[in-house]
Structure formats: structure tokens, C-alpha cells
UniProtKB/Swiss-Prot annotation:
Binding-site residues, nogalaviketone: Q95
Name of this protein: Nogalonic acid methyl ester cyclase
NCBIfam families assigned: SnoaL_meth_ester
Keyword Isomerase: yes
Involved pathway(s): Antibiotic biosynthesis
Keywords for this protein: Antibiotic biosynthesis, Isomerase
Catalytic activity: nogalaviketone = methyl nogalonate
Lineage: Bacteria, Bacillati, Actinomycetota, Actinomycetes, Kitasatosporales
InterPro entries: Cyclase_SnoaL-like, NTF2-like_dom_sf
Length: 134
């Protein structure tokens, strides 16, 4: 999973993403379920935070079917982020990801990024009048 975000390579997502994959946080971006949804998420991250965006693994924990990943996202704000125009600023933000592995693949995925710290590094931008609604 981390490799996909770091390289942008998603042609192999069927190997590690379950057909019923869901990350509820992506629904507001029009990204739904399954391996193609994960590939869309990778594309969105790279379009919003640049091709230079990368995740660094801090710690990975496993308990039964659950995996908890402590990560840091590094990037540069180059695309629209919930209605906020690009600032071109660099940032790093800690994240926690919780995933359930089913049939050897990631099926359930939640993530909690540090929105407050990230926005502060981006200069605390506001959405423009267009907002984030389609």
C-alpha cells in the first residue's frame, strides 16, 4: 500500500486490495469501493500533493486481522484540497491508518491525518467561493 502512494504505481492493486475495499473518508471525493477506488485515491493524493508526495513508515502493528500503520505524509500542495486552491507549500503530516485484512488483502481502511498541523503548514488557507461541492 505505501509503495503505491510513493511510486504512483497501481497496476498491481488487485494483488493486495480486496474487491470490497472501502475507505469511508474517500467517499466525499467521489471515490467509492474496490481496487479501482484505491487506485483513484493514490491518483488523488499525487494530484493534490504532487508527484513528490511520499509516505514514511514510522511503525506498523498487527493484531489478528487488523493492521495499524503510523505514517508521515510528505508533500507539496499543488491541487485543490477540499475547496482550497493550491498554495505550493511543502508540508509533513503524521497519520494513523487502521486496516482489516480479509483473504490476505486490505478490505477495510480508515485513516486519521493531522489536518490541523497540515493546514497550519499550508498557511491556514480558506476554501474559495467554489468550495468543494461538485
Amino acid at each position: 500500500m505505501v509503495s503505491a502512494f510513493n511510486t504512483g504505481r497501481t497496476d498491481d492493486v488487485d494483488e493486495y486490495i480486496h474487491p470490497d475495499y472501502l475507505n469511508p473518508a474517500t467517499l466525499e471525493h467521489g471515490i467509492h469501493t474496490g481496487p479501482k477506488a484505491f487506485a483513484q485515491l493514490v491518483g488523488w493524493v499525487r494530484a493534490t500533493f504532487s508527484e513528490e508526495a511520499r509516505l514514511e513508515e514510522v511503525r506498523i502493528e498487527e493484531r489478528g486481522p487488523w493492521v495499524k500503520a503510523y505514517l508521515v505524509l510528505y508533500g507539496r500542495h499543488v491541487g485543490r484540497l477540499v475547496g482550497m486552491p493550491p498554495t505550493d507549500r511543502r508540508f509533513s503530516g503524521e497519520q494513523v491508518h487502521l486496516m482489516r485484512i480479509v483473504d490476505g488483502k486490505i478490505r477495510d481502511h480508515r485513516d486519521w491525518p493531522d489536518f490541523q498541523g497540515t493546514l497550519r503548514q499550508l498557511g491556514d488557507p480558506w476554501p474559495d467561493d467554489e468550495g468543494w461541492r461538485p
